[in-house]
A protein has these predicted regions:
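Glycine-rich loop motifs involved in handling phospho/adenylate chemistry
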Residues: 263-272, 296-297, 344-347, 372, ...
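Adenosyl-5′-phosphate
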Residues: 11-15, 31, 87, 162-163, ...
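Short low-complexity, flexible loop/linker segments enriched in glycine and/or proline
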Residues: 331-335, 357, 379-381, 572-574
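Membrane-proximal basic amphipathic "stem/tether" segments
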Residues: 384-433, 438, 596, 623
Length: 635
């Protein structure tokens, strides 16, 4: 392909990512190899032109386009200067250090040394190979697609790949079935038949002439990490464990404060974000924090966050979000999503990101603590409920389950609100979930039931033959308990495919870089070395993190039901979003889309609007699916 045509196509792809990098743009082509690399820059480190990309290594062998941060780049630079003084590192960016590290150590040995979040493409001019690399936990996204007529395209978002005329928009219906179950598409699937996600902790190697065959190399294996941690368990007591966790987190936060632009933090008032902010205030007296407050009492964490901020001495900003503000954001969310994604908490995450971006360019987030340290209700209550249910004959469990599922969810919600005795949001949904759990036939079945939005997605997605697995690993770690098996599944699937995807898309939509210190890979390894009792005990999760935070804040501030940025989607779909819902999921519109069974959708709408069941998760999944399909012209 002529260099001009090749470059023109990559330019169109590059501009689809302008929101991810508004500060600069670059293009590099190798016409002989038919390879072009494009980049949009969000300037964080070395704001000069020395940090511009694509960037070439000191040897001239490698060219890179890089998204993310190598937080320990200063230490690596010093080490390189000591062992390879002849290797010149241009400028002060972590990208330049990355390239020098690959020059000196090779890719795999360099990756072992990196502490960070990253997705990058590395072109080897000598071997004529392209390597696509994604960080250990999947914090940064990276996609690859086969193109009609030959060749491949890659990008941080599928929207950029879709700008290439050779991209096929055919739906992967098996992946869509899994999406309806989990509200996100499990890696490596994407929702498109010809596109994949690069899996966390791996890199793909593609060779010329057509780069069509990709070989996957695992450089960070979560199974090996967990098994290795269990082989060398932490031997100290809970106080010693809390001190070691604090040491690791303190260094993780310190590294993530390195920036040439202003840095702040999201603060919901919960354990995770409060821990991050507390450690930030030890490193700086000038910490800015951001939260949103809601008109809905059940979802308003504004006062809680403000109390934490006051005690920690941060410069705190609260955005009080009206119903109109949030509903307006609903209309903008589909343009941020390049694959089906149904986690409605992306709406408040986008709103708090928008507010933060007016003051800072980088924000630290508390995401990841739940998956590592047993913070979800399923980790705390799931094993207990399973053991208790096994003492009851199956026929009796099924009978009780049917009775619970007949209770109208909306009625339970209203009664709970009037009595004020429920410490959980949406008690009707929780009662119905309990009814479904009583039908579970195994511990694994219970976990799937806890995560499922649509319980029988193969009956809903037209043409789907089987669901793709939530985690396609060839083997599982030798885990000691039901709770730990759920935590592992959450770490390798729910965390990258849902939580981190949400944070990346919501923050990058407004050109804000979000950093997640709780899932530094050193913290991950330590967390898995801890005995379960330090994570979950006496129906309380994240015990070790509570102990750590208790040294800084009064227990009453965080010893309460789980908080976070949320919205009353169930009520909105019956109220101000009712017409939007009916329009998006009108039977004729669903039928014309050709992806799902119209009657199944209509029945779900009826159950929710009548108040017989709380189906807001399932319905929002379906709205997001149709918005995605219409935006990309999916068939």
């Amino acid at each position: 392909m002529p260099a001009e045509e090749l470059g023109g196509r990559v330019l169109r792809m590059r501009e689809a990512l302008a929101h991810r990098g508004p500060d600069g743009a670059g293009l590099w082509t190798d016409a002989d190899a038919s390879v072009a690399l494009g980049h949009r820059r969000l300037s964080i480190l070395d704001l000069t032109s020395d940090g511009a990309q694509p960037m070439t290594s000191p040897s001239g062998r490698y060219v890179v386009v890089f998204n993310g941060e190598i937080y320990n780049y200063r230490d690596l630079r010093a080490e390189l200067a000591r062992i390879a003084p002849d290797v010149a590192v241009r400028g002060g960016s972590d990208t330049a250090v990355l390239l020098a590290a690959v020059d000196v150590w090779g890719l795999e040995r360099a990756l072992e040394r990196f502490i960070g979040m990253f997705a990058f493409a590395l072109w080897d001019r000598e071997e004529r190979t392209l390597r696509l690399v994604r960080d250990r936990l999947g914090i940064k996204p990276l996609y690859l697609a086969r193109l009609q007529g030959g060749g491949v395209a890659f990008a941080s978002e599928l929207s950029a790949i879709a700008a290439h005329p050779g991209f096929s928009r055919t739906a992967d219906r098996n992946a869509l079935a899994s999406y309806l179950r989990y509200n996100c598409v499990p890696a490596p699937s994407t929702g498109f038949t010809d596109a994949i996600k690069v899996r966390p902790g791996t890199f793909l190697t593609l060779r010329t002439p057509d780069l069509s065959v990709a070989r996957e190399t695992v450089f960070w294996d979560p199974v090996a990490v967990v098994d290795g941690a269990h082989a060398r368990p932490f031997r100290g007591d809970e106080d010693e464990a809390a001190r070691e966790l604090e040491r690791l987190l303190r260094d993780s936060v310190r590294l993530r404060l390195i920036s040439d632009v202003p840095v702040g933090a999201f603060l919901s008032g919960g354990i995770d974000s409060s821990t991050v902010v507390a450690l930030m205030t030890d490193e700086s007296t000038d910490v800015r924090t951001f939260t949103i407050a809601s008109d809905s009492r059940s979802y308003d964490e504004g006062a809680q966050a403000a109390a934490v901020a006051s005690l920690l001495g941060t410069q705190h900003e609260t955005l009080r979000v009206s119903q109109a503000d949030a509903l307006g954001a609903v209309q903008r969310i589909p343009s941020m999503l390049d694959e089906p994604f149904g986690d409605s908490s992306i709406i408040p995450t986008y709103l708090v990101s928008s507010m933060a971006r007016r003051h800072v360019t980088v924000a630290l987030s508390g995401d990841g603590g739940d998956e590592l340290l047993g913070g979800y209700n399923r980790h705390v209550w799931g094993p207990t409920m399973w053991r208790a249910s096994q003492r009851v004959p199956r026929f009796a469990r099924v009978r009780v389950a049917r009775g619970l599922l007949r209770l109208p969810a909306a009625t339970i919600d209203r009664v709970g609100e009037q009595l004020g005795r429920f410490s959980v949001r949406l008690p009707g949904q929780q009662v119905h979930k309990l009814g479904r759990l009583l039908k579970a036939q195994s511990e694994d079945d219970l976990y799937i039931a806890l995560r499922s939005h649509w319980r029988a997605p193969l009956e809903v997605v037209l043409g789907a033959a089987r669901e793709v697995p939530a985690w396609p690993g060839a083997r599982a770690p030798a885990l000691r308990s039901h709770a730990e098996r759920m935590m592992f599944a959450d770490m390798v699937s729910y965390l990258p495919d849902d939580i981190l995807t949400k944070v990346d898309r919501a923050s990058m939509a407004v050109s804000l870089e979000a950093r997640v210190p709780l899932i530094d890979h050193r913290v991950v390894a330590f967390a898995w070395s801890l005995p379960e009792r330090m994570k979950v005990r006496h129906l309380t999760g994240k015990r070790i993190l509570r102990k750590l935070l208790g040294r800084r804040l009064p227990a009453e501030l965080f010893d309460r039901p789980k908080s976070g940025f949320g919205i009353p989607m169930a009520a909105w779909l019956r109220g101000p979003l009712r017409e939007y819902l009916l329009d998006q999921l009108a039977p004729a519109r669903v039928r014309a889309g050709g992806l799902v069974e119209p009657q199944a959708v209509a029945d779900c709408v009826e159950r929710h609007l009548s108040g017989r069941a709380d189906e807001h998760d399932a319905l929002w999944d379906m709205v997001a699916l149709h918005s995605w399909a219409e935006r990309f012209g999916v068939s």
